[in-house]
Amino acid sequence: MDIPFKTKRILRFGDCDISGTAYFPAYLDILNNVNEEFWQALGYAWHETIPNAGWGTPTVHLSCDFSTPSVFGDVLDFELRVLKVGRSSLTVRHYITCQGEARWDSTQVLVASDLNKHCAIPWPDEVRKALMACIPNPNNDH
């Protein structure tokens, strides 16, 4: 997997309001899909870890800053950077651009969670190792 993780999304008709501008709740759905793609690229596809390993990664914090509107048909470039890996938390930063122009960005904190007990758990060792490998300089405090 390339570091930082990058992917593209076309802004579809259903992602927009009546004016053809991106509807912000659709952005959150797209962001969730980007997260799912990141985990799959990392080797921990949600469709396998959720039913088989019994843990998931719910979002416990999300902040977004919107700088420029996007419109139907725009190709959005998503960049996901792992900033910090805690005992059970993961802080990521999303940068979303279109043709090099910033559109919005987001900081998100996800937590490893036991899906039966609904509580935070430490990252499994192999998952922690994979996440730490996503930090360009793990000794650098972000």
Predicted regions and their residues:
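Terminal targeting signals and extreme-terminal segments of soluble enzymes
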Residues: 1-77, 83-142
